[in-house]
Amino acid sequence: MKNKKRVLIASSLSCAILLLSAATTQANSAHKDSQDQNKKEHVDKSQQKDKRNVTNKDKNSTVPDDIGKNGKITKRTETVYDEKTNILQNLQFDFIDDPTYDKNVLLVKKQGSIHSNLKFESHKEEKNSNWLKYPSEYHVDFQVKRNRKTEILDQLPKNKISTAKVDSTFSYSSGGKFDSTKGIGRTSSNSYSKTISYNQQNYDTIASGKNNNWHVHWSVIANDLKYGGEVKNRNDELLFYRNTRIATVENPELSFASKYRYPALVRSGFNPEFLTYLSNEKSNEKTQFEVTYTRNQDILKNRPGIHYAPPILEKNKDGQRLIVTYEVDWKNKTVKVVDKYSDDNKPYKEG
């Protein structure tokens, strides 16, 4: 009888333990589900916040006491993308409020992307029917529209730069003083600095010799292009050339070296970072700026199959551009897009 009681008690204890374990597991599972849901909601909110940050083109950030006593910076950003040309303009406008200077001050950083639009084409009507269109030049143009009260006082980069990477820092200090240096870093403890940094391997940056107080232009031009074990100049008609019997007019890509070996600016595109420093007379309330991003394309024409016909090179034969007009309100420190258009078959030509 005692043994039966012990068995019943043990059985009851086992059931109780199992029920308690199940309840604990269910509670833990519910707690985990709650945590996962909270995490998901947190991630969703973060993603929504990030999307708002990306789509909010009128960003505003004020940093007091950054330019000496009572100085501050107001930052705005405008982004314009054109699907037809596959070009994106992203401009940062930094308004510098300096009580020791009698003019408005503005830094404009021109960023974004100019996609390569690398293309292999077939043109059966020509003997050299297999074509390669590649971006031989990229151009960024900035000009003040019909307003002599707003002037460009400095720019980055300057002159000609042939290094694979470009790094420069612009620094503004109270009283309208400014300076620029190579590399990334602040030039003084009591100043506001802005840096530019971009890659241009196998290309050169050239600031136009015709730049003035209302117009600046930069060209990023292909030089000696390295791909695989080859190095050929942009002016060489044998650039990217491949003579093979498997190439046909139906497969123009086979008449050229593998595109995966091409330099990044040929294969993918260019991400500019150019800077302009401007001053404005305080009697002038608004100024418009016209910004143009352009892609120039060379065309290489090869004949498919085994042959002895020379390839053909046509420089700056094609091009696409995006032109955007921005209006700055100096009093309210705001920026808006007032006009935009794009077109094809418009390679940049100086002059």
From Swiss-Prot:
Bias-annotated ranges (Basic and acidic residues): 30-60
Entry superkingdom: Bacteria
A Gene Ontology biological process term: cytolysis in another organism
Family annotation (InterPro entries): Bi-component_toxin_staph (IPR003963), Leukocidin/Hemolysin_toxin (IPR016183), Leukocidin/porin_MspA_sf (IPR036435)
Cellular component annotations (GO), alphabetically ordered: extracellular region
Pfam families xrefs: Leukocidin (PF07968)
Region span, Disordered: 28-71
Disulfide bond sites: none
Keywords tagged on the record: Signal
Signal peptide per UniProt: 1-27
Family the UniProt entry places it in: Belongs to the aerolysin family.
The protein's name in its UniProt record: Uncharacterized leukocidin-like protein 2
Species of origin: Staphylococcus aureus (strain N315)
